[in-house]
Design a protein with these regions (language model features):
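Acidic, gly/ser/pro-rich intrinsically disordered tails
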Residues: 1-5, 149-167
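OB-fold/S1-family single-stranded nucleic acid-binding modules
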Residues: 130-151
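Beta-strand elements of well-folded, non-transmembrane domains
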Residues: 42-44, 125-127, 147
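OB-fold ssDNA-binding interfaces and closely related basic DNA-contact patches used
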Residues: 1-85
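Intrinsic disorder/low-complexity segments enriched in polar/small residues
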Residues: 9-12, 100, 106, 121, ...
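Signature of Gram-negative chaperone-usher
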Residues: 69-108
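Exposed beta-sheet edge/beta-hairpin loop segments within beta-rich domains
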Residues: 94-119, 126-136
């Protein structure tokens, strides 16, 4: 298996509906250790390229007949900076009205329930070799998430606009 030597900048990814998110590190049935991580869907050409250079990509069958298969990458979110080798990730949340907030270890959990409009991220590889097995795991370097406009806010604005038109 080739070892990955460069950071890969991924754009135009989907971490919305149907993807796994655990930025808060909550212990679950399928995540007994409470590992902070999330998954992203990748375009086929990006997924196959990353797989070719050593990344582990999950191939998901089509959800419905006629759909394309999906390619999923799990990304770790680590705040463990004991060795000083890697700084903690930079995570920003942009709201639909343009406000931007930086999220930290104790606030990143809000992304677990955020309705995501768009996301851009940078990941770094971590090449591992344990008990004769080797691979490459993706870790988050930087993430900017744009939240979808909440329906309540949209409905309130529409009502306000209608009231202004009536005046």
């Amino acid at each position: 298996m080739p070892f990955v030597k460069e950071n890969e900048r991924l754009e135009h990814i989907s971490i919305g509906r149907g993807t796994y998110r655990n930025f808060g590190g909550v212990k679950t049935t399928y995540n007994k250790s409470g590992e902070r991580k999330f998954s992203v869907f990748l375009p086929e050409e990006v997924a196959l390229y990353l797989e070719d250079i050593g990344w582990y990509i999950k191939h998901k069958p089509p959800y419905r007949e006629g759909d394309d298969p999906q390619y999923q990458l799990d990304v770790g979110v680590s705040y463990d900076t004991k060795d000083g080798k890697f700084p903690p990730p930079i995570i920003r949340l942009k709201t639909w009205d343009g406000e931007e907030t930086e999220l930290y270890e104790d606030t990143a959990c809000v992304l677990d329930s955020t309705d995501i409009e768009d996301a851009e991220m940078e990941i770094r590889p971590y090449n591992w070799n344990v008990d004769g097995k080797a691979g490459c795991k993706a870790y988050l370097v930087e993430l900017t998430v744009t939240a979808r406009k909440p329906r309540r806010a949209l409905n309130a604005r529409l009502r306000r606009d209608e009231e202004e038109e009536e005046d």
